Design a protein with these regions (language model features):
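Short, well-structured N-terminal submotif of metal-dependent ribonuclease cores
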Residues: 1-37, 51-66, 109, 118-119
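Residue-level signal for well-ordered alpha-helical positions
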Residues: 15-16, 48-51, 70, 89, ...
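A short helix-to-beta-strand connector/capping loop
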Residues: 31, 71-73, 124
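Phosphate/NTP-binding elements of NTP-utilizing enzymes
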Residues: 45
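Short loop/helix-cap segments at secondary-structure boundaries that form the rim of catalytic
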Residues: 119-126
Length: 129
């Protein structure tokens, strides 16, 4: 399984052409192994709608349910070990709790994270694609 960062998941569902071709290729290449989406990404999507930084033509709950029903998508639940790991990330990592939880999820599940987030890309203590 690979873990999709929130922005990758949203753009892939809304319009995959918003993603660079290299990211589209990574998703296609790893689909058969499973595409993980952290439950925190669901919270982030709802928060982005609340803050008017995203806009959907449907209720956010319906959008999330539809987006999670895509083939090969696996919802990755928050566990106590992920919660604790997010507070113990080695090295320097920025203070965004959602990013901390997503990185901790990738670390606990020992799977690569697909992201375009520069702050996460600069972090050397998580497997990246």
């Amino acid at each position: 399984m690979i873990l999709l960062d929130t922005h990758i998941w949203v753009k892939w569902v809304l319009d995959e052409k918003q993603l660079p071709e290299s990211v589209q290729r990574q998703i296609i290449e790893h689909e058969k192994d499973g595409l993980g989406v952290s439950v925190i990404s669901c919270w982030e999507v709802a928060k982005l709608l609340e803050l008017k930084r995203l806009n959907f033509d449907m209720d956010v709950s319906d959008w999330i349910n539809q987006a999670l029903s895509y083939p090969d998508i696996q919802l990755v639940e928050l566990s106590p070990s992920i919660a604790v790991e997010s507070t113990r990330l080695p090295g320097e990592f920025h203070r965004d709790p959602a990013d901390q939880l997503i990185v901790a999820t990738a670390r606990i599940h020992d799977c690569p994270l697909l992201t375009l987030d520069r702050k996460i890309l600069a972090y050397s203590h998580v497997k990246l694609l």
